[in-house]
Amino acid sequence: MRVLPLALLVGLLAVSDAKVLGKCEFARLLETRYNLSRNDIKNWVCIAEFESSFNTAATNRNRNRSTDYGIFQINNKYWCGSDYGKNVCGIPCSDLMSDDITAALRCAETVRRATERYRGRGKGYTAWVAYNSKCKKRDLDQYMAECWSRGSNSIFPF
């Protein structure tokens, strides 16, 4: 019986580490902290929304027994360190679930560049299922309109 309360406490602590960002908050972070271009921001925002709902601690177990981690849902079969995969990004998968998204963004860029080398220039985001099904054919400027002011390259609505 004492195991159940301990398990609940551990579960609550794990959940409390998660940070769920808002769409415009995430876009602002990508612009101000990481100095990304508007084109990159709109793609990463769309991917993050449909992969993780902007949850930095999201995980998803796949049919092939691999797991996707973090706000960009990066897979452990190739990209992050686990007993399962190749760890191309050179980081433990747990780093992808931090509230500080630096490691997740760096690894996501590694995935994008590697995919472009394999599939061709401009095809890097196709590594994400969400990009192919939700973002690729969407008007991403319209999608981001609530975050960006008109006629400006800034995402600040003033």
From Swiss-Prot:
<feature type="disulfide bond">
    <location>
        <begin position="24"/>
        <end position="147"/>
    </location>
</feature>
<dbReference type="GO" id="GO:0050830">
    <property type="term" value="P:defense response to Gram-positive bacterium"/>
</dbReference>
<protein>
    <recommendedName>
        <fullName>Lysozyme C</fullName>
        <ecNumber>3.2.1.17</ecNumber>
    </recommendedName>
</protein>
<dbReference type="GO" id="GO:0005576">
    <property type="term" value="C:extracellular region"/>
</dbReference>
<dbReference type="InterPro" id="IPR001916">
    <property type="entry name" value="Glyco_hydro_22"/>
</dbReference>
<dbReference type="GO" id="GO:0031640">
    <property type="term" value="P:killing of cells of another organism"/>
</dbReference>
<feature type="disulfide bond">
    <location>
        <begin position="46"/>
        <end position="135"/>
    </location>
</feature>
<keyword id="KW-0964">Secreted</keyword>
<dbReference type="GO" id="GO:0003796">
    <property type="term" value="F:lysozyme activity"/>
</dbReference>
<dbReference type="Pfam" id="PF00062">
    <property type="entry name" value="Lys"/>
</dbReference>
<feature type="disulfide bond">
    <location>
        <begin position="89"/>
        <end position="107"/>
    </location>
</feature>
<comment type="subunit">
    <text>Monomer.</text>
</comment>
<keyword id="KW-1015">Disulfide bond</keyword>
<comment type="similarity">
    <text>Belongs to the glycosyl hydrolase 22 family.</text>
</comment>
<dbReference type="InterPro" id="IPR023346">
    <property type="entry name" value="Lysozyme-like_dom_sf"/>
</dbReference>
<keyword id="KW-0378">Hydrolase</keyword>
<keyword id="KW-0929">Antimicrobial</keyword>
<feature type="active site">
    <location>
        <position position="51"/>
    </location>
</feature>
<feature type="active site">
    <location>
        <position position="68"/>
    </location>
</feature>
<dbReference type="InterPro" id="IPR019799">
    <property type="entry name" value="Glyco_hydro_22_CS"/>
</dbReference>
<dbReference type="GO" id="GO:0050829">
    <property type="term" value="P:defense response to Gram-negative bacterium"/>
</dbReference>
<feature type="signal peptide">
    <location>
        <begin position="1"/>
        <end position="18"/>
    </location>
</feature>
<keyword id="KW-0326">Glycosidase</keyword>
<feature type="disulfide bond">
    <location>
        <begin position="80"/>
        <end position="93"/>
    </location>
</feature>
<keyword id="KW-0732">Signal</keyword>
<feature type="domain" description="C-type lysozyme">
    <location>
        <begin position="19"/>
        <end position="150"/>
    </location>
</feature>
<comment type="function">
    <text>Lysozymes have primarily a bacteriolytic function; those in tissues and body fluids are associated with the monocyte-macrophage system and enhance the activity of immunoagents. Has bacteriolytic activity against Gram-positive bacterium M.luteus, and Gram-negative shrimp pathogenic bacteria V.alginolyticus, V.parahaemolyticus and V.vulnificus. May play a role in host defense.</text>
</comment>
<keyword id="KW-0081">Bacteriolytic enzyme</keyword>
